[in-house]
Amino acid sequence: DLKKCKQGKDFGRGFYLTSSYEQAKNFVPLSVKKQVNIGSMVEGTTEGVISVFRLHLTSDVNVYTFDSADAAWLHFVTANRRKDLFPNLASQYQKYDIIAGKIANDRTARTLQIYISGGYGEPGSDEADRIAIETLLPNRLENQFCFCNQKAIQTLEFVRGDRCELGSF
C-alpha cells in the first residue's frame, strides 16, 4: 500500500529501490532502527533483510531518469522535501510511474538542508544551485528508483530476501 510510504522523500511518495547491493546493505541498520522506533520490530533485533527484485518494464510504464545530480534534479528533490519551494515542480512529474536518479543520502543531507534554508543564496538561483551541486558531487552519489504507483509496483518480481547480521557492517 503506497499510502503508507512516507512523504518528503527525494522523488516523492513511493517504493524505493537501488541497483547497488552494497548501498542496500549499508541501509539495513538504519532501516531496522527506524522500524524498532515505530514498533514494527523488537528492540535487540540482530539482523535485517535485503530484498532483491527483478524489473519487468513494459512499454506502457512511463519512466523519467535524472541522468545526473544537476539543477533539475536538485530542484525536484527540494520540491519534494519542502513543498513551498518550487511549488509547481513536483506535479510536473506526476505522469511518471517510475522516477530514477541520484540519491540524496545521509552524507548529503546537510548540503541539502543548507541549500533549502538559503545558506548558499536563494534556492533556484544560479549561484545557490552551483554551490550545492559542487558540494554534492564529490559524495559519489548512488542511484535510486521510486516506484510511484501500483502500475510501477506490478513491474517488480520478488526474487529473494538476503538476511544480513547487523553486526557485519
What are the residue ranges of the model-derived segments?
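A short, exposed loop/beta-hairpin motif centered on an aromatic-Gly-Thr core
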Residues: 10-16
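Conserved NAD+-utilizing ADP-ribose enzyme module
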Residues: 5, 9-10, 25-26, 30-169
